């Protein structure tokens, strides 16, 4: 479960980075 949660968290962070990049652009 911990590993799965970590993977989901990593994906969420990546999505946030993409959203920030779109806002900056």
Curated annotation (Swiss-Prot):
It comes from the Eukaryota. Residues 1-10 have a biased composition (Basic and acidic residues). Residues 16-25 have a biased composition (Polar residues). Residues 1-25 are annotated as: Disordered. Coiled coil: none annotated. This is Unknown protein 4.
């Amino acid at each position: 479960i911990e590993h799965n949660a970590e993977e989901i968290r990593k994906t969420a962070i990546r999505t946030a980075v993409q959203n920030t990049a779109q806002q900056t652009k």
